[in-house]
Amino acid sequence: MSAALQQAALGLAAGEVPIGSVVEADGKIIARAFWRLRDGLLAHPELVALQASNRRDVTLITTLEPCLLCMAAAMFAFARRVVYALESPTDGGTRIEDFWNPAAGSVAPYRFPEVVGGVERARSRQLVAEFLERHPDAPLARWAETLV
């Protein structure tokens, strides 16, 4: 999680909402990203890191609970595990597991990854609070307020 938090801090330094992600395989970080809203609404760090890793059986480590889009991406990338720091009450996607029920005998290869939440929650929340102090009128400030 420390590497994901470092990515989030880089995002904060760049004036972005501090969300960072890394992808780990075989105990090594193979991809990393932080949110760059200026790169587009879909440039979520989870998506960017998963795409850059281009591997199966990875662990996605992120400072914010992945949204539905990012959880689906983790499933489609065959991530084995998702670890996150801070819950996202308005759009967190890890609860999709409660509804994910592939049809019996389905040939769909996608499986819901193991999910671990709350790792370094306080540090991630602190970074979001720092962002709000520095950028109270940022485009996503109102949403970011739901995280602290």
Mark where each language-model region is.
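Short beta->alpha transition motifs characteristic of CBS
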Residues: 30-37, 114
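Small-residue (primarily alanine) positions within well-ordered alpha-helices
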Residues: 4, 8-11, 21, 31, ...
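A structural signal for isolated positions on well-ordered beta-strands in alpha/beta enzyme cores
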Residues: 22, 59-61, 81-83
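Short HxH-centered metal-ligating active-site micro-motif
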Residues: 42-76
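Short beta-strand scaffold segments in enzyme catalytic cores
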Residues: 19-27
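Zinc-dependent deaminase
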Residues: 1-11, 73-148
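Short, flexible loop/turn motifs enriched in small residues
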Residues: 14-18
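Active-site metal-coordination segments of metallo-dependent hydrolases
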Residues: 1, 38-43
